[in-house]
Swiss-Prot record:
Full protein name: 3',5'-cyclic-AMP phosphodiesterase 4A
Residues annotated to bind Zn(2+) 2: D460
PROSITE patterns attached to this UniProt entry: PDEASE_I_1, PDEASE_I_2
Sequence intervals crossing the membrane: none
Length: 844
C-alpha cells in the first residue's frame, strides 16, 4: 500500500504520536486479516440472581425486537433511490480485500450453536450468524483501509460488505483482533510446513489436522508460504513492540478509529464550507479534544471581529454545593390511590393504548407525553419498573417511587428544547427495549438492570441546554467544580443521587450496603459514558471485544467480570442516547427539530456574549439535513453497526430503519426545489439568508468539475483568502458550475466578502432566550423565513432551495450573463453560474 499523504494545513488534524526517531513506520496488516471466517458469538447467560428472592418468571422463546411502527414507506424519496456506499463524503478507499490470498488450514467446523466449547454446562444462547437479508447493507467508514490516505474516490471503490457476506466472512478491523488472527494463521502455516499436527487443546478446540498436506505442495509454494508466514510474524512482533504497556489493547483500536475519522472529516471539510462546519461539529463533540485533537484556528481574514465576552458576574457559592436543586413538595396522598401508570391523567385509555408498545422499538413518546399530561418520564419509569417487577424485587415503596419520579422529572428543564424529561423518557424506554434483546436474555442481574434503568432516567437531569464546551468557555461554576472533565455528566449524577436524600425519595432504602455501593458504581460508569467526547473510546472498546471473540476459537462472550459487563451496559445506554436516527422517520424529524432549536439557542447566547459561535449553532449557516447525514455516517452508524454485531440478528431492523432515515435526509438535500430566476437577484440582498452548502460531491460531479474548470482561474481557497479583491470575486464566479451543489457556498462567501468590504450590516434582533413547550412546534418561531426560503422543504425547517442542483436554470442564466467579468460572449458554455452572483445581485 502507498504511504499516507500529508494532511492539508487547513484540515482538521489529530495530534497523534508519530514513530520514534530511527523507528520505521508500522506496516499495514496482512491483507487476509481484513477477512476472517464468520465466527458465531454466543453471550453466556447467568445462572444466578442477586435479588432477595429468586423467582425467575417463565421466559418466552427468543423473538426479535418488535417495532412499534407500521410506516408506509411509499412516500419516502430516500427509499426509491439507489443505495450507495457511505459515508458519502468519501466513496470508498479500500483495496478490495476479497481478492487477497487467504490460508485457511486451521478453520474447522463451528461448534454446536447451543453449547460452549469451553463450558459444557453453559446455558443455550443466541449465536451470531450471517444473514442473507443483510448482505447488501452498507458498512461504516471503519471498514475502509487504514493506509489509503491518498487514494482518490474517483479511482477507488469498495464493495466489501457484499463480498464478505457472500463468502461467509467477517471483516476484522481492530488491531488486537488482527494480531490474534495473524498469530493463529502463523500457527496454522507452521503446522503445514513442518507436518506437525495441530493438537486438540484449549487453544484450538476447533482445529484438527491441516486440510492440506505438505506433500501436495510444490517447493515454490512452500517457499512462498514460508516467506509470507515470516512476514506475518514480523508484523505481529512489530505491533506488540509498539504497544504501550500501561494502556489497554482496546486503546489501539480507539487510536486507529480516531485517525480514520479524522481522515474522513478532512475529506468532508475540503468539500465546502458547510462540510467543514459539519466536520468541526463532529470533531468538537465526539472526539476527546483535550488530549488528542488539534483544530487550527481560522486565519485573521476568515475570523470575523468579535467583542471579548463580558466579565461574568456570578454570586459566590460554596464549591461543595450541588446547584440546580429545588425544594418541591409532592403530596403524601399518592399512596392512597395510585394511578395505573403512575401519573394522573384524564386520557388513561389513550395512554394505555400507546403503552402497549412499551417494549417495542419506536414507541411514540410524544403521544405518551401528551396523554400523560407532560409527565412522560414519570409514566415510563413507573410502568417499566412495574413490568419488570423491580418494586417487589428491591422492596421499593410505591409512594417513595412516585415521589422520586415526580421530583426527578421536575428537575429537568421544560424550557430546554431537547435535553428535557421527554428525552430522558425516550432514552429510558430505549434502554428497556435493549435490555430485553433476546441475545442478552438472562445475561444481566436484576441489580444491573435496575442500575441501567436508573442511569437512563437521570442521565440528563438539570441539563441547562448548552454544551460542556460552552460551560468551560464561560468559566461556569460547574466547569470549575468538575475541572472541565465531563462537566454536565458529573452534574447529572450529583443531582440524581442528591435527590435520593430528599424527603421520601430514597427508592434504594432497602438495598443492602453492598448492593447500594455496587449500583452507585455502575450508574456512575454508565452516565459518564454518555459524554459524547468519549464516543470513540466506547466504540473501540466494544468493537475490540466483539472482534476478539470472533477470531478466537470459542466465540463465546462470557461476560464473567465487571469490566466486560459494564462495558456492554455503558454501550447500551450510549446507544439508547444516540437512538433518535434509528426511530421511525416522523419521530426522528421531531427530535432533529428539537436538537437544532437547542443548538440555535446556544448560538444566540454565544452571539450575545461576543463569543465564537459553536459549529452547527449558528442558525444563519447551519445545514440541518447535511448535519444529520454526517452524524449518521460518522457517529451513529458505526456504533449501531457494532452493537448489531454483538446481538445479531436482533438489531437488524434497527439498522434498516437507520439506513432508510439516512437515505431520506440525503434525498431531502438533493430533491429540494431550486429558486426561480425571478427570486435569484434578491438572494444576496437578504442578510438573514442562512449559509447552506452542499458537502457531497458525487463522482460524476467531480468529473464535471474537471471538465468545466476554466484555465487560468484561481482556486476557491485562493479567492476566499483575498476577500477584498473584487476581481478575484468575479473570477471565482466562473468556477461554480463544476460544483453545482455548492453554488450557494460561493454565493454566500461572496456576500460575506462584500459585506466585510463595505461594512457589515447591523445584526437584526433574533429570538434569544426563547422558551419551548414540549407540545409546541419549535423551529418555526426562531425566525421569519424570507420568500426564497418558503419553498417546500422539511416540516419546521428552512428550505434547502438555495442548495439544490439546477443545471438547466444555470445554463439559461449563463447564456444571459455573457457580459460577466471573466467570461466572454463566445464562450458561454464555460460560464459557471447565473448572473445573480455578481455584485448587488446583477451581472458584474
Amino acid at each position: 500500500m502507498e504511504p499516507p499523504a500529508a494532511p492539508s494545513e487547513r484540515s482538521l488534524s489529530l495530534s497523534l504520536p508519530g514513530p520514534r526517531e530511527g523507528q520505521a513506520t508500522l506496516k499495514p496488516p496482512p491483507q487476509h486479516l481484513w477477512r476472517q471466517p464468520r465466527t458465531p458469538i454466543r453471550i453466556q447467560q447467568r445462572g444466578y440472581s442477586d435479588s432477595a428472592e429468586r423467582s425467575e418468571p417463565e421466559r418466552s422463546p427468543h423473538r426479535p425486537i418488535e417495532r412499534a411502527d407500521a410506516v408506509d414507506t411509499g412516500d419516502r424519496p430516500g427509499l426509491r433511490t439507489t443505495r450507495m456506499s457511505w459515508p458519502s463524503s468519501f466513496h470508498g478507499t479500500g483495496t478490495g480485500g476479497g481478492s487477497s490470498r487467504r490460508l485457511e488450514a486451521e478453520n474447522g467446523p463451528t461448534p454446536s450453536p447451543g453449547r460452549s466449547p469451553l463450558d459444557s454446562q453453559a446455558s443455550p444462547g443466541l449465536m451470531l450468524h450471517a444473514g442473507a437479508a443483510t448482505s447488501q447493507r452498507r458498512e461504516s467508514f471503519l471498514y475502509r483501509s487504514d493506509s489509503d490516505y491518498d487514494m482518490s474516490p474517483k479511482t477507488m471503490s469498495r464493495n466489501s460488505s457484499v463480498a464478505s457476506e457472500a463468502h461467509g466472512e467477517d471483516l476484522i478491523v481492530t488491531p488486537f483482533a488482527q494480531v490474534l488472527a495473524s498469530l493463529r494463521n502463523v500457527r496454522s502455516n507452521f503446522s503445514l510446513l513442518t507436518n506437525v499436527p495441530i493438537p486438540s487443546n484449549k487453544r484450538s478446540p476447533l482445529g484438527g489436522p491441516p486440510s492440506v498436506c505438505k506433500a501436495t505442495l510444490s517447493e515454490e509454494t512452500c517457499q512462498q508460504l514460508a516467506r509470507e508466514t515470516l512476514e506475518e510474524l514480523d508484523w505481529c512482533l512489530e505491533q506488540l513492540e509498539t504497544m504501550q504497556t500501561y494502556r489497554s489493547v482496546s486503546e489501539m483500536a480507539s487510536h486507529k478509529f480516531k485517525r480514520m475519522l479524522n481522515r474522513e472529516l478532512t475529506h468532508l471539510s475540503e468539500m465546502s464550507r458547510s462540510g467543514n462546519q459539519v466536520s468541526e461539529y463532529i470533531s468538537n463533540t465526539f472526539l476527546d479534544k483535550q488530549h488528542e485533537v488539534e483544530i487550527p484556528s481560522p486565519t485573521p481574514r476568515q475570523r470575523p471581529f468579535q467583542q471579548p465576552p463580558p466579565a461574568a458576574v456570578q454570586q459566590a457559592q460554596p464549591m461543595s454545593q450541588i446547584t440546580g436543586l429545588k425544594k418541591l413538595v409532592h403530596t403524601g396522598s399518592l399512596n392512597i390511590n395510585v394511578p395505573r401508570f403512575g401519573v394522573k391523567t384524564d386520557q388513561e385509555d389513550l395512554l394505555a393504548q400507546e403503552l402497549e408498545n412499551l417494549s417495542k422499538w419506536g414507541l411514540n413518546i410524544f403521544c405518551v407525553s401528551e396523554y400523560a399530561g407532560g409527565r412522560s418520564l414519570s409514566c415510563i419509569m413507573y410502568t417499566i419498573f412495574q413490568e419488570r417487577d423491580l418494586l417487589k424485587k428491591f422492596h421499593i415503596p410505591v409512594d417513595t417511587m412516585m415521589t422520586y419520579m415526580l421530583t426527578l422529572e421536575d428537575h429537568y428543564h421544560a424550557d430546554v428544547a431537547y435535553h428535557n424529561s421527554l428525552h430522558a423518557a425516550d432514552v429510558l424506554q430505549s434502554t428497556h427495549v435493549l435490555l430485553a434483546t433476546p441475545a442478552l436474555d438472562a445475561v444481566f442481574t436484576d441489580l444491573e438492570i435496575l442500575a441501567a434503568l436508573f442511569a437512563a432516567a437521570i442521565h440528563d437531569v438539570d441539563h441547562p441546554g448548552v454544551s460542556n464546551q460552552f460551560l468551560i468557555n464561560t468559566n461556569s461554576e460547574l466547569a470549575l467544580m468538575y475541572n472541565d472533565e465531563s462537566v454536565l455528566e458529573n452534574h447529572h449524577l450529583a443531582v440524581g443521587f442528591k435527590l435520593l436524600q430528599e424527603e421520601n425519595c430514597d427508592i434504594f432504602q432497602n438495598l443492602s450496603k453492598r448492593q447500594r455501593q455496587s449500583l452507585r458504581k455502575m450508574v456512575i460508569d454508565m452516565v459518564l459514558a454518555t459524554d459524547m467526547s468519549k464516543h470513540m473510546t466506547l466504540l473501540a472498546d466494544l468493537k475490540t471485544m466483539v472482534e476478539t471473540k470472533k477470531v478466537t476459537s470459542s466465540g463465546v462472550l462470557l461476560l464473567d467480570n465487571y469490566s466486560d459487563r459494564i462495558q456492554v451496559l455503558r454501550n447500551m445506554v450510549h446507544c439508547a442516547d444516540l437512538s433518535n436516527p434509528t426511530k421511525p422517520l416522523e419521530l426522528y424529524r421531531q427530535w432533529t427539530d428539537r436538537i437544532m432549536a437547542e443548538f440555535f439557542q446556544q448560538g444566540d447566547r454565544e452571539r450575545e456574549r461576543g463569543m465564537e459561535i459553536s459549529p452547527m449553532c449558528d442558525k444563519h449557516t447551519a445545514s440541518v439535513e447535511k448535519s444529520q447525514v454526517g452524524f449518521i455516517d460518522y457517529i451513529v452508524h458505526p456504533l449501531w453497526e457494532t452493537w448489531a454485531d454483538l446481538v445479531h440478528p436482533d438489531a437488524q431492523d434497527i439498522l434498516d430503519t437507520l439506513e432508510d432515515n439516512r437515505d431520506w435526509y440525503h434525498s431531502a438535500i438533493r430533491q429540494s426545489p431550486s429558486p426561480t430566476l425571478e427570486e435569484e437577484p434578491g438572494v444576496l440582498s437578504d442578510p438573514a439568508l442562512p449559509d447552506k452548502f452542499q458537502f457531497e460531491l458525487t463522482l460524476e460531479e467531480e468529473d464535471e468539475e474537471d471538465s468545466l474548470e476554466v484555465p487560468g482561474l484561481p482556486c476557491t481557497e485562493e479567492t476566499l483568502l483575498a476577500p477584498h479583491d473584487t476581481r478575484a470575486q468575479a473570477m471565482e464566479q466562473s468556477k461554480v458550475k463544476g460544483q453545482s451543489p455548492a453554488v450557494v457556498e460561493v454565493a454566500e462567501s461572496l456576500k460575506q466578502e462584500t459585506a466585510s468590504a463595505h461594512g457589515a450590516p447591523e445584526e437584526s434582533a433574533e429570538a434569544v432566550g426563547h422558551s419551548f413547550s414540549l407540545e409546541t412546534s419549535i423551529l418555526p418561531d426562531l425566525r421569519t423565513l424570507s420568500p426564497s426560503e418558503e419553498a417546500q422543504g422539511l416540516l419546521g425547517l428552512p428550505s434547502m432551495a438555495a442548495e439544490v442542483e439546477a443545471p438547466r436554470d444555470h445554463l439559461a442564466a449563463m447564456r444571459a450573463c455573457s457580459a460577466c467579468s471573466g467570461t466572454s460572449g463566445d464562450n458561454s458554455a464555460v460560464i459557471s453560474a447565473p448572473g445573480r452572483w455578481g455584485s448587488g445581485g446583477d451581472p458584474a
